[in-house]
Amino acid sequence: MTSSPVPVQTDLRPVLSRLAKGEHLNEEEAFAAFDLIMRGQATSSQIAALVMALRLRGETEAEMGGAVRALRSHMIPIKAPDGAIDVCGTGGDGAGTLNISTAVTFVVAGCGIPIAKHGNRALSSRSGAADVLTALGVQIDLGTERQEAILHDEHCAFLFAPHFHPALRHAAEARSQLGIRTLFNLIGPMGNPAGVKRQLTGVFDPIWAAPMARVLGELGTETCWIVHGLGLDELTLAGESQVTALENGSLRQFSVTPEEAGLPRAPLDTIQGGDADHNARVLQALLDGADGPYRDTVCLNAAAALIVAGQTGTLKEGVALARRSIDDGSALSALNRLRAATNAIP
């Protein structure tokens, strides 16, 4: 991924004209176009036209790489504890499940792994990470310095994207009005402001797994799993999931099944979610010890996160650690500590 200077883009219309002809942008051109968006120099109509043109024609790895670089160039960075990871998904899968990665956050934190959970409110679903955390009583509207302090003190924090990526406000109206997945869904998980070197990322379409892993590697990520499970941006209990792993500078692609982790299969409808309040109640019940497919799904994904974190080497061992985190109250304690820290008067 080149870091050569790029021309300053001052008007998105020439780019739109090229895309209308079916042309591709190279990485530097994509950087310039998205940099213009981040600087507030494109209208909502132009932004919507750009991301829809890319989606209809098919986004390229170079375009994704340039867009990620633009996103990162405008973010407010913080420093994470050593060994910190992120667990998130692109969204946009349209499945309407319970919040998986948010629950995984507390299970993994309960295992002693620092976790800088990066996320937003729902844009193309009913309940995003920010929505369910708010319903759980976690205060997300905190300054970046306060969140950095919480991350270091509690080893668990939610990095609310609008606070760390203020430039994305210029695209908010277009994204909300479109209400569908776009390139922004792909680049969001690659813009963790804490600069984590390890992450578990779910993707709405497995075609993007290898490109995302390569781009993350070029941006300094050491280990990541990009996962997709039968339409979900998560590992699933419903059948076989696809994984693209970046490890030691190399990509490895493989599939995993619930049986490999020692878990029973369960259909997708067993983890159907609702609004933020409903999903928060179910997540709280999970941390309080409730059993069932939701717990198993969370444990499966937590196991993957623990492998990425270097805590274990197999899914079966990871599931055992995840179950212990829930059963001994460590996961619940992680939520309670985060809730208390974010609501404390500084």
From Swiss-Prot:
Cofactors required: Mg(2+)
Pathway(s) annotated for this protein in UniProt: Amino-acid biosynthesis; L-tryptophan biosynthesis; L-tryptophan from chorismate: step 2/5
Listed GO MF terms: anthranilate phosphoribosyltransferase activity; magnesium ion binding
Positions annotated to bind anthranilate 2: 175
Highest taxon listed in the record's lineage: Bacteria
Secretion signal, residue range per the UniProt entry: none
Pfam family, one: Glycos_trans_3N
GO cellular component: cytosol
Job description of the protein: Catalyzes the transfer of the phosphoribosyl group of 5-phosphorylribose-1-pyrophosphate (PRPP) to anthranilate to yield N-(5'-phosphoribosyl)-anthranilate (PRA).
Entry-linked HAMAP family: TrpD
Protein name in the entry: Anthranilate phosphoribosyltransferase
Species name: Granulibacter bethesdensis (strain ATCC BAA-1260 / CGDNIH1)
